[in-house]
Amino acid sequence: MVNGSPRVSEKTKQKVLAVMKENDYTPNVFARGLGLDSMKTVGIICPNIADSYMAKAVAYLESSLHSYGYDCILGCSGFGQEEKQNYVNMLLSKRIDTLVLVGSTYAGNGKDEYDTDYIREAAEKTPVFMINGRVRGDNLYCACADDCQATYE
């Protein structure tokens, strides 16, 4: 009923909503997600939120996602390979609907495939969006800025 089932009459919906309000009931987001294909949650990882570019990018992402009814879980992974992988795995365990990686550090060093394998593995479970980084693979979506041109302008 709380998930908006069309099989529940309007009269019953109103009664249930009144009882919920009267008792200050808040639905459990995890229990709600059990019956749905979506948790309406996006995981966002950046290396360091203290960086002004990262902070602005994350603030814009979060604001935009909230306008579409999505909650966000933010993680600041640092730059170490193991830490980045741990954050990705932690967010995947939270049943996120998609993963957004902010910053070129997630694209690896360009020499070793292994350092981005964890991203391709994550993309097998949920869509992965990379901002200012590029990794090739299925279910991976990348947007890159031309930093040199931006500096010139």
Regions of interest found by a model, annotated:
Residues 36-153:
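Alpha-helical recognition/docking segments in bacterial nutrient-uptake
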Residues 1-39:
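N-terminal helix-turn-helix DNA-binding module of bacterial transcription factors
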